[in-house]
């Protein structure tokens, strides 16, 4: 319901529902709610045009209309570039690249997020997604281990630390 309200541009309503979901018992649901809530609240204050385009791009992604989503994301980058929405925009472009099996592009987009926007609320997720990409799709286990280690060391409060720690141990055991 919150995401639907976000898609149709009812941001205040969406925020109200997301604030309830943030107290969810599931860490991942609460984290997803927090991510969307931060995206909306940050952009409501800064740039509502970019927020409208981001929500439209997200809706296209939901519909699996990736070409239209990419066009919408490119229009934000061209006409409304801002530091607030850029990490989220890059994560959406990486998601599309993954779907298109353009793994090298996805790798570079994830890197741009956690290297250029390390203070972003999605930098930890970008590190995790990149580690999984490197491990499973590009067969670069050493690079994946570095991403997992960076996530463990630099994002100690992340909900993804346990997953990263388990993956790191598994890869280290395979290596030895």
Where are these regions (language model features)?
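Acidic, polar-rich low-complexity tracts and alpha-helical solenoid repeat scaffolds
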Residues: 1-176
């Amino acid at each position: 319901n919150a995401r639907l309200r976000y898609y149709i541009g009812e941001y205040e309503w969406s925020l109200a529902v997301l604030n309830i979901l943030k107290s969810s018992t599931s860490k991942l649901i609460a984290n997803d709610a927090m991510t969307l809530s931060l995206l909306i609240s940050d952009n409501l204050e800064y740039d509502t045009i970019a927020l409208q385009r981001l929500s439209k791009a997200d809706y296209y992604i939901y519909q699996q209309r990736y070409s239209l989503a990419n066009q919408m994301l490119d229009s934000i980058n061209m006409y409304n570039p801002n530091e607030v929405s850029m990490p989220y925009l890059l994560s959406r472009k990486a998601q599309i690249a993954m779907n298109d099996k353009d793994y090298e592009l996805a790798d570079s987009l994830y890197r741009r997020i956690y290297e250029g926007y390390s203070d972003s609320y999605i930098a930890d997720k970008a590190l995790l997604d990149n580690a999984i990409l490197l491990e499973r799709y590009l067969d670069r286990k050493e690079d994946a281990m570095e991403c997992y280690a960076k996530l463990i060391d630099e994002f100690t409060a992340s909900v993804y630390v346990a997953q990263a720690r388990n993956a790191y141990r598994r890869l280290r055991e395979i290596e030895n």
